[in-house]
Amino acid sequence: MIDKIKGHIADVESFNAKTKDEIEAFRIKYLGKKGILNDFFAEFKNVPNEQKKEFGQVINELKTAAQVKVNALKEDLENNQEEKGVYGDLSRPAEPVEIGARHPISIVKNQITEIFSNIGFNVSEGPEMEDDWHNFTALNLPEYHPARDMQDTFFIQTDPDILLRTHTSSVQVRYMEENKPPIRTISPGRVFRNEAISARSHCIFHQVEGLYIDKDVSFADMKQTILYFTEQLFGKSKIRLRPSYFPFTEPSAEVDVYWGLETETDYRITKGTGWLEIMGCGMVDPNVLRNCNIDPKEYSGFAFGMGIERIAMLLYQIEDIRMFYENDLRFLEQFKSAL
């Protein structure tokens, strides 16, 4: 029996193969579940005691020789293929590679982030589940303030003080609490409002809000920053600011960009005016600065905010906001080129 095993060792050491199939057949012959090695191991119990030590040694030698031979043959085959450039038919078409696409909301968010990063703004983030102080009170919206009715809010049933944030201004409050001026930050993120879902509104959407706090910041600084943004994102260099109201800024304004009236689509989306509303803005209210332990006599600043979905709808001429959330591949695959 021992001589028979030694004969197999010699066969293993002299074996050669030229293909993967031959190597695999060799591996199965010796190392497979029904291979020669397992047959010898099964015979171990029938070997006389005085021969068991030597029998075990030669079996292990056969196993090691087979494993070494398989590995060596595989390595030689790979090396030979690389040297000869043998990878099959090189004219054969490659297997198709499925390439994904970024979501249009992510594309626009990244574009906005890059534009403001180029002028020194960093990115700040905060929790989507927020408390009353950071979402309302610190932003000059005390309890029972009538402006709270502007935002229909989702409250947490077990704790009325906890809610789903209605804007990313709450992130700005947290940032001002933790950082001293000068401050230049934008806060992109998801927000929630209890609104009816339609082609123009949704209960979940995304915002980018910006904040700039420093000494001697003026309304003109804000206008110039917004003008830079519209030129970079839309390629439009004409804007107008209309008086508006936001509890956390004073004075406040709505920003319109002149879209033009060159096409039928321009007439439709601007309702014949040539102007499109894109964001709100204003000088940070002194009460907000005080609530965040910033002295309004020393510092001033401006804030702005926009809906990412609205910007994406303008850029890509999308008429229904619900399309962003339906995960329809026919829609999403159209943005592969925007990676």
Curated annotation (Swiss-Prot):
Cross-referenced CDD domains: PheRS_alpha_core
Domain of life of the organism encoding this protein: Bacteria
Cofactors that this protein relies on: Mg(2+)
Binding annotation for Mg(2+): 250
Pfam families named in the record: Phe_tRNA-synt_N, tRNA-synt_2d
Subcellular locations according to the entry: Cytoplasm
InterPro entries (alphabetical): aa-tRNA-synth_II (IPR006195), aa-tRNA-synth_II/BPL/LPL (IPR045864), Phe-tRNA-synth_IIc_asu (IPR004529), Phe-tRNA_ligase_II_N (IPR004188), Phe_tRNA_ligase_alpha1_bac (IPR022911), Phenylalanyl-tRNA_Synthase (IPR002319), tRNA-bd_arm (IPR010978)
One GO MF term: tRNA binding
A Gene Ontology BP annotation from the UniProt entry: phenylalanyl-tRNA aminoacylation
Keywords: Aminoacyl-tRNA synthetase, ATP-binding, Cytoplasm, Ligase, Magnesium, Metal-binding, Nucleotide-binding, Protein biosynthesis
Family of this protein: Belongs to the class-II aminoacyl-tRNA synthetase family. Phe-tRNA synthetase alpha subunit type 1 subfamily.
NCBIfam families per record: pheS
Record-given protein name: Phenylalanine--tRNA ligase alpha subunit
Organism, scientific name: Christiangramia forsetii (strain DSM 17595 / CGMCC 1.15422 / KT0803) (Gramella forsetii)
Gene assigned in the entry: pheS
